[in-house]
Amino acid sequence: MAANSGLDSKVEYYRLQENEIISAVSSEDADQNDAGFRLSTIHLHLFHGLKFAALLFTVVPVFIILDSMKIIFQRKRRFCLDHVNRSFLRQSSWILDERICQYVLNPLFVCLYPSTFSSPTYVKCNIPIEDQKSPENNIFQDHQLNAPKIVSTKFYQYVMPEGFDPTTDPVLVFYHGGGYALKLTPTSFSFLNNMRNAFPKMAILVPDYTVTATDDQSKKYPLQILQNVAIFDYVVKTMGCKNVVIMGDSAGGNAVLNIVLYLRKCHREIYPKKVIAISPWANATFFHEGEKEYMQGTQEWDGLCLKSHSMFGRMFVGNNPNVDFTSDPFVNIEKNFETKMWQDILKKCSVMITYGSDELLSFQNKILAKKMSDASEGCNHFTAKNVLVEHQGYHTGPILNYSRNMDRWTNIPSIARILEFMQS
């Protein structure tokens, strides 16, 4: 949120450190504390920045070379530059830890936001009493989660076409990935720009939910779910948008599926028109029997590794030993799939799931797609056309395709299917 002008550095410091001011402190002491806090933060940025740079420019190149040689000599596939890109993404994710996300990558990504992100829209939402009292909404029924009753968040207008009519024109709300731990990465900008060119009359909004790369338990699950629902509510209620498409990749795929699940659990009437989950994070903390072994085999072709997947899962839920996250339907959507809930959801909005056959998450996504298909049996709301399995595709492949040639981009099979679904 934007800083209040009436708050001085003393108040800001204690708000960060203690969440409340217990006693009055002299201005001189506050200035010293504030300076010490800034120095400590700078030290952390420098230390973890140097650590990340050292690993990125020493360890990562070595493993990229080893991965490339392995492909060439084993001859399982024809070697191409795409394999180098996957290896770079995979090895880069392998060297990540919570501090690198918090003190290096997230500040860097924010600095790289395009000029169109200069004026965010802030949203403050009081969670409806009906949501809090719904017996099906475990976020509030499980009091150990300490779910907030008021949430604040923001979103950016990536593009707002001139003369946009919220009652008829489409709006795409794009929930970015990154394991809920990372800010919007620059790799998404090319995809969003191509979407803008493909649909000139479509507005594109990008939510900026709170990331989990922090020790603060209050910034872990379920905050992100509530923030994402708050953005959707703002779009349909305050902005009055009727033709809403919500899309997300990886953790963003988890987000868009959780939004409609939350709406159903709270017996809401307004749903998005379409939901597109690209390589959705269907289970954040749960692994099926044999799934880890499967992931260890598929990760050699993917851009994501098992180590980072597990790390993001731990960061998402945080340290709350009083909660069984394994059985939480928002944390592990596929594992706790509620057929009746999704039958109702699929009658109210169209859902599309895409993933690649080379993906680390393909095991859980295949099961999720099958469960959705079974839930829609006899209704034809979720058919084979709603599932795209890209042959030898990797994690969030459609988002990571950097082509600026619109003719070439729109003819990529995965992109073409997504565009067709949006236009249907």
Swiss-Prot record:
InterPro entries named among the record's database cross-references: AB_hydrolase_fold (IPR029058), GDXG_lipolytic_enzyme (IPR050300), Say1-like (IPR019436)
Active site: S250, H395
Gene3D superfamilies: alpha/beta hydrolase
Any one GO molecular function term: steryl deacetylase activity
Motif placement: Involved in the stabilization of the negatively charged intermediate by the formation of the oxyanion hole: 176-178
Principal location: endoplasmic reticulum
One example of a Gene Ontology biological process annotation: response to toxic substance
SUPFAM superfamilies: alpha/beta-Hydrolases
Membrane topology summary: Single-pass type II membrane protein
GO CC annotation, single: cell periphery
The protein's Enzyme Commission number: 3.1.1.-
Keywords (A to Z) from UniProt: Acetylation, Endoplasmic reticulum, Glycoprotein, Hydrolase, Membrane, Signal-anchor, Transmembrane, Transmembrane helix
Positions of post-translational N-acetylalanine modification: A2
Record field: transmembrane: 46-66
Domain of life: Eukaryota
Residues bearing attached sugar chains per UniProt: N85, N283, N401
Location within or outside the cell: Endoplasmic reticulum membrane
Cytoplasmic side: 2-45
Lumenal topological domain: 67-424
Family according to the record: Belongs to the 'GDXG' lipolytic enzyme family.
Function: Required for the deacetylation of acetylated sterols. Involved in the resistance to eugenol and pregnenolone toxicity.
Name of protein: Steryl acetyl hydrolase 1
Species name: Saccharomyces cerevisiae (strain ATCC 204508 / S288c) (Baker's yeast)
Gene: SAY1
